[in-house]
């Protein structure tokens, strides 16, 4: 399946009963559930590796005919109908009459009884009646999408977004589809073009320009240069004439959607964020030193002059940066600062961008910590933070410490500093790690401006110096090959040095052999030798999603090994089952839930009558019961991309490293992957791929003017 969940490959059987020949289907099938029956339109082609396959251009669902097929359709397509309820429906109406009778009057579900004559729970009945009405609308929409060459798997999302009037909405302005996450401009454009919209239609051009800017943001850019925008729009829209594009951009500027500033094109919202954040940070950088509290070192706590220097800076300056390499003492410095500030009766807030990072901060410092979103009291119903300039954090705190600050995007940093008030703020991070997932590079821009007081710790402490993980990470950071064996490390560092055997390199050359080695390491060798639980303690981190050693392939293989058997399927489309390890792919701020992007969980069990799943999160500290629909935002997580692992650490980490990833390999990517390991890291793959990554020291450039805005404020 592709990253946007649109493209997928399925193995299908022909015929209404599924008893015909097997065929490989490729195309916009990412939202299709296993066991679905489809009518597909497309062409047969011959693939050089996979042979003959059917390339699906569009499809629609076909209703099943058999009793088993109807029951399966009910459980996979209608929320609230579990296996017991589905079987009772088929027995009551007969397989050949279920759709006819329920389309006519879904209230007839109230007549259904179990095989023993018991009534179906009222809650399940009400949910199923409401769901049937929605599904009926979805089936009508599938026909509409099919006629316009769009995969019918999107229908459910569109109905949830636009309601019963969805066909009228899409006919009136197909480009409204781009409002939905993970549905691209090209899908909307296919509908629009099939409805007769011209290439140079003004609505089309404006939607295309918006999409190019949004895609740039997803790559971390706050803006695009005009030339970059024109080139991206030309490729997307297939319009070579600049004049209509300039007219469309002018319209977006007049409508307040876009800001053009010195050849830089921003979405207005991002321009406002960057400008506001620049002013807030600039004011802190220019502020005269003022003592927040008196401080004396605690003689019972060992602290270096550099570490105590951080305490002195934070005590007197409203914004301080603490950066440093692994093992340099950033965490110990935070502990010293918190202990000193609390002795002075300061109110201290510890926070981090992710829940995993906040828990790690809590465990390492011994003090409570929370996500930045929780600290700022994000309200999902209002889509805004309750803490702001009118209700600042300084009403409750004197000092704010933010860990993993390299993950701060423009949006999150803007919200934080808009609400900081008179608090002194310490940002702690490692600028050599990957930049944030969202637009901007706040910590790197602050460092580059050289306007904000910064302490960069480099010394390696004795306990950390024993770790080959830390020694190798430091070598990677400086462009040198990591120690590929403990013997090599001892030879380089001195034969009598004490070292922990916590970093290994396993040489493999072909992608398939790398994959096999990863499976053996995760499932057998690491548990047997080191005692780690392969389900709970070992994480595989990969550079990219596709390929034989990509995220999808490894997750499928590891699911078979680590969650075998016929455990109950919870969400058919994604293959999530009871026992699966899963990861949240977008922030969920639902009251009493709050699961952040990147949080890992286990599916403990599934109630098919209530259509709810019970999850274990926070390393077993928390359990949640969620509707199965909420699991649409989760993916299997025996393996994660390195990017998604930011802010997290795991007891044991396995990193496949292949030249098959060559376009993605870089020094920051390898450095970030290695530093996710707490006790054991195994790098598996090709030495040449490691060398290639080390040679790419620079991260991909991001368009940001935050440092420039800071410098401008310094001269005001």
Predicted regions and their residues:
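Accessory alpha-helical DNA-binding modules that contact the DNA backbone or grooves
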Residues: 33, 48-263, 319, 323, ...
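Conserved helicase motor core of P-loop NTPases
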Residues: 288, 310, 330, 432-592, ...
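ASCE P-loop NTPase helicase motor core
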Residues: 311, 320-493, 688
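Flexible glycine-rich surface loops and low-complexity tracts that mediate binding to linear polymers
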Residues: 35-50, 652-655
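Pre-P-loop entry segment of helicase/translocase ATPase cores
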Residues: 202-206, 214-218, 253-312
């Amino acid at each position: 399946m592709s990253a946007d969940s649109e493209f997928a490959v399925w193995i299908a059987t022909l015929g209404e009963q599924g008893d015909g020949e097997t065929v490989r289907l490729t195309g916009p099938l990412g939202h299709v559930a296993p066991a679905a029956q489809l009518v597909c339109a497309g062409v047969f082609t011959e693939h050089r590796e996979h042979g003959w396959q059917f390339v699906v251009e569009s499809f629609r669902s076909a209703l099943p005919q058999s009793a088993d097929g109807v029951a399966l359709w009910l459980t996979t397509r209608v929320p609230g109908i579990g296996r017991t309820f589905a079987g009772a429906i088929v027995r009551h109406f007969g397989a050949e009459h279920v759709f006819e009778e329920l389309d006519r009057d879904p209230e007839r579900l109230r007549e259904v009884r179990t095989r023993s004559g018991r009534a179906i729970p009222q809650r399940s009945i009400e949910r199923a009646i409401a769901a049937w009405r929605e599904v009926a609308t979805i089936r009508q929409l599938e026909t509409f999408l099919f006629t316009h060459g769009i995969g019918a798997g999107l229908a459910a999302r569109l109905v949830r977004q636009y309601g019963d009037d969805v066909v009228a909405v899409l006919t009136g302005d197909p480009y409204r589809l781009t409002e939905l996450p993970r549905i691209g401009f090209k899908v909307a454009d296919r509908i629009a073009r099939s409805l007769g919209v011209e290439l140079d239609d003004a609505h089309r051009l404006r939607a295309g320009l918006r999409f190019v800017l949004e895609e740039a943001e997803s790559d971390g850019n706050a803006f695009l240069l005009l030339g970059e925008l024109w080139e991206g729009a030309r490729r997307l829209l297939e319009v070579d004439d600049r004049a209509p594009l300039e007219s469309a951009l002018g319209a977006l500027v007049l409508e307040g959607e876009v800001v053009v500033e010195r050849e830089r094109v921003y979405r207005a919202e991002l321009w406002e964020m960057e400008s506001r954040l620049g002013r807030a940070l600039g004011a802190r950088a220019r502020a005269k030193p003022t003592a927040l509290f008196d401080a004396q070192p605690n003689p019972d706590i060992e602290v270096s002059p550099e570490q105590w220097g951080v305490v002195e800076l934070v005590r007197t300056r409203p914004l301080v940066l603490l950066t440093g390499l692994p093992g340099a003492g950033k965490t110990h410095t935070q502990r010293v600062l918190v202990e000193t500030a609390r002795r002075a009766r300061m109110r201290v807030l510890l926070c981090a961008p992710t829940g995993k990072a906040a828990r790690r901060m809590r465990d390492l410092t011994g003090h409570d910590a929370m996500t930045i979103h929780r600290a700022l009291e994000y309200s999902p119903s209002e889509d805004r933070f309750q803490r702001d300039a009118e209700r600042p954090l300084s009403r409750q705190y004197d000092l704010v410490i933010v860990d993993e600050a390299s993950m701060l995007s423009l949006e999150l940093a803007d919200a934080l500093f808009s609400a900081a008030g008179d608090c002194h703020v310490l940002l702690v991070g490692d600028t050599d790690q990957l930049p944030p997932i969202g637009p901007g590079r706040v910590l790197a821009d602050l460092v580059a401006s050289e306007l904000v007081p910064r302490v960069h710790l480099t010394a390696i402490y004795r306990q950390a110096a024993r770790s080959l993980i830390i020694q190798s990470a430091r070598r990677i950071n400086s462009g040198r090959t990591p120690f590929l064996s403990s013997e090599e490390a001892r030879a380089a560092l001195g034969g009598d040095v004490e070292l922990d055997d916590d970093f290994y390199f396993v040489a493999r050359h072909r992608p398939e052999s790398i994959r096999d080695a990863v499976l053996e390491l995760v499932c057998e060798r690491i548990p047997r030798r080191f005692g780690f639980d392969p389900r709970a303690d070992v994480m595989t981190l990969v550079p990219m999603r596709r390929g034989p050693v990509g995220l999808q392939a490894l997750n499928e293989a590891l699911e078979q090994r680590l969650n075998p058997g016929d455990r109950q399927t919870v969400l058919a489309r994604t293959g999530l089952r009871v026992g699966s390890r899963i990861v949240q792919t977008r922030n969920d701020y639902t009251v009493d839930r709050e699961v952040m992007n990147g949080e890992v969980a286990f599916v403990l069990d599934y109630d098919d009558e209530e259509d709810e799943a019970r999850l274990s999160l926070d390393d077993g500290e928390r359990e949640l019961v969620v509707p199965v629909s909420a699991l649409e935002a989760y993916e299997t997580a025996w393996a994660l991309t390195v990017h998604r692992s930011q802010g997290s650490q795991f007891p044991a980490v396995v990193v496949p490293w292949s030249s098959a990833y060559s376009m993605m390999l870089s020094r920051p990517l390898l450095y970030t992957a290695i530093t996710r390991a707490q006790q054991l890291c195994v790098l598996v793959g090709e030495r040449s791929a490691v060398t290639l990554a080390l040679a790419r020291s620079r991260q991909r450039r991001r368009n940001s003017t935050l440092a420039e805005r800071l410098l401008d404020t310094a001269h005001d």
